[in-house]
Structures are given as structure tokens and as C-alpha cells.
Amino acid sequence: MNKYQAVIIGFGKAGKTLAVTLAKAGWRVALIEQSNAMYGGTCINIGCIPTKTLVHDAQQHTDFVRAIQRKNEVVNFLRNKNFHNLADMPNIDVIDGQAEFINNHSLRVHRPEGNLEIHGEKIFINTGAQTVVPPIPGITTTPGVYDSTGLLNLKELPGHLGILGGGYIGVEFASMFANFGSKVTILEAASLFLPREDRDIADNIATILRDQGVDIILNAHVERISHHENQVQVHSEHAQLAVDALLIASGRQPATASLHPENAGIAVNERGAIVVDKRLHTTADNIWAMGDVTGGLQFTYISLDDYRIVRDELLGEGKRSTDDRKNVPYSVFMTPPLSRVGMTEEQARESGADIQVVTLPVAAIPRARVMNDTRGVLKAIVDNKTQRMLGASLLCVDSHEMINIVKMVMDAGLPYSILRDQIFTHPSMSESLNDLFSLVK
């Protein structure tokens, strides 16, 4: 049996970064990845990087086939780079195969050339998440039905794309494919569009999408899916929709089943997420879990922060924990992007805080005029007692950069006036924060 000080399951952001750090510290490390098409993890291969590459090219009205080619070039470059960053290092063995726990120190790696058993003093799980496939008759057998990975590898642009699910993944793909020229229909089972956002923000997003030609159908309870005359037929309670391709955008769930974590005494919750404490320990003393597999926020930057927590315990002072995370921002890369940090207005009011809410139309921002995209709105919530920001929603071009400025001021516990009076370059989208916070009375 091959023995290692550290065995890392999954080539994601946390796993690959931890592997390099431990190898540099002199540890003997094995990193197990089930697919050689996934070196670098979800983000590089089937998530952030390919989707945002296509979002960019769609905004430039690049031909779809050429955009797919460029996406593949970007992904292949980064995948190869990530592989060699690890495989070429002393002390690291990259092992291709499907890992399965035998016990809390031993793993069986299933490989075409024969199974391999390895021993790890410490084991780290970073296997990510996978698409949730709802139990709709025909969804797994009908040609033309894709998860996000499959849709990223289409050979030609669908004339009409249906999207099953109106959450953030669905919105991002809807905007992208509408920009490429597809007709897009979102089918959302809920009665409310983007329920985690304030209604004014969600309504703005819906307006932007509809102006792009996207149809949004709420209360769409799909009963079955079939195939007829080279189209996907989506049958719901009151209507039938024919599309050229259908995207399953019903969310993602932790990828743990094939690991058989129970063999190692690792507890999982009802969604299959690995149960961890604030330092990412599982219920097995020598095993940690990082990233999407823990069932938390599914962002690459959270996986990276998970790595920092584990690194600090193994090689540092052991003081870092998930409790240190303050305000986690996120962006939805529709056109223009939505970015948010902190509370919504609804959450702030429910908290009982005495608040002010200010909004600024993007049409009032000079830089937005220069860039010829005046769609959207900026919104901020300020605590009247502390003068601190409780949250912000930015629906505008470049919001994915601006939100990080807001986050840093919030994390530092500084008053909103820091942004009101900050000196920004001109003309820039960031300087609109001067105007937004000047509206606070």
C-alpha cells in the first residue's frame, strides 16, 4: 500500500492549493482526481472560467462557434498549467481515478488499469458539487437536454433555448445565450422570481432579461419531457413548449455518494453534504472537507478561504475559522452583472435595525453613458445608529469589481461616509459610490 502524509481527493481550488503548500513544507502528498478533464477543478473546467469567457464573447457578439473554440483554448491552457503546477513538483503524486473510503486512513482508487489502495495520515476532501437533476419523466433520456457542462460544449447555437430553473445559473445562461442570438425561455416552478433578492432588484433584472428577448414563465410545473421532430418538448400543467435545447439549472448538490464516506465514519447531512465544524474537521479526526462538498456557499473564493483555514491549522497558529468570514459578496454575470454583499432591504428591516435605503439609477452615472449601458440600479442599506453599511445590491456594468470596494469598507466597520467622500478616478463606475452614498441623509 502506498503511504502518504496527506491525501487530497479532488483537484479543486482548495485541494490543489493545499497540495502545493504541503509539498513545499516537505510533506509527501497524493492528489486524487477522477477525471483528467478536471485538473484545476470545477471553476477552471466547467464553471467560472468557461462561462465567463463565453459571457464576454457574447457581449462582443462573437460568432458562437468561434466563442466555443476560444473558450476551449482558455480552458485547455489553464487545465494544463494547473496539472503541471502539481505534477512537476517533488513530493506530489497526481493519481487519476475514483476514490472510495475503505476506512478513515485507507482509500481504494478505481482505475481502468487496476485498482490502487493508498494510506493517508491526513485526508482532505475537495470533490465539489454536481447538478441536481429533478425527477421529471424523460429528463435523463431525452436528446437535447443538458446540464451546464453539456451546454458549454454545444457545436452550434440553439435557435430556442429552454432553461429549467430561474435561479442565478439560469439567469446567467439566459443572458449569455440571448446575447449570442438565441431565443430563450426560463421555466421557473416558483411563483416568485429570484426570491433571495429584493423585489425592486429582481424586477429590474426581469426587465433587463425581457428587453433581451428572454421569456420568464413562473409557476411552470413541468410534468414530463419528450422529443419530437428534432425538438425537446416540455410538457407542463397548462402548456407545452418546444425548444431546440433544454438546460437543467435546478441547482447543485455536494458530490459525495461515490466516496462512501460512511466507511470512514464521516457524517453527511440530508443533502449529502459533509458535516464539518468551524475549522472544517469532519466527524473523523484525521479528515477535513473543503469547498462545495461541505454544502456551504458554492464559490471558488470560499474554497480558497477554506484552504487558508486548514493551512493555518496544519502549518500556522490554528486561529482561523469560518467564523472569521464577515461579508461574502457574490456576482451573477448576466449583462449587466448583479453583485451583492450583506443584507437585502427586507433582511435589514426584519432585523429591527433603524435603516435608510438609498438608490441611484445607473442612467445617472457618466461612465455608464460612456460605455453605452445605462441599465440597472445601485442600492445600499445604511444603519442610522452606527452609520455603517448593512448591505448593497449593484446591478450595473462593472458591478463585479465595485462590490469588492463596498465589502472591504463593511468588513473594516467603517461608516458609509468613507465611500461618500472617497477620491475615485474619473470617469469610472466606482465613483458612482460617491453619488449613491451622498443620498444618505
Swiss-Prot record:
Annotated binding of FAD, by residue: 33-43
Induction conditions: Induced by RclR in response to hypochlorous acid (HOCl).
One GO BP: response to hypochlorite
Alphabetically ordered keywords of this record: Disulfide bond, FAD, Flavoprotein, NADP, Oxidoreductase, Redox-active center, Stress response
Active site: 426
Disulfide bonds: 43-48
Pfam families: Pyr_redox_2 (PF07992), Pyr_redox_dim (PF02852)
Cofactors demanded by this protein: FAD
KW Nucleotide-binding (keyword) present: no
Function: Probably involved in reactive chlorine species (RCS) stress resistance.
PANTHER family (alphabetical): MERCURIC REDUCTASE (PTHR43014), PYRIDINE NUCLEOTIDE-DISULFIDE OXIDOREDUCTASE RCLA-RELATED (PTHR43014:SF4)
Additional detail: The active site is a redox-active disulfide bond.
The protein's name: Probable pyridine nucleotide-disulfide oxidoreductase RclA
UniProt source species: Escherichia coli (strain K12)
UniProt lineage: Bacteria, Pseudomonadati, Pseudomonadota, Gammaproteobacteria, Enterobacterales
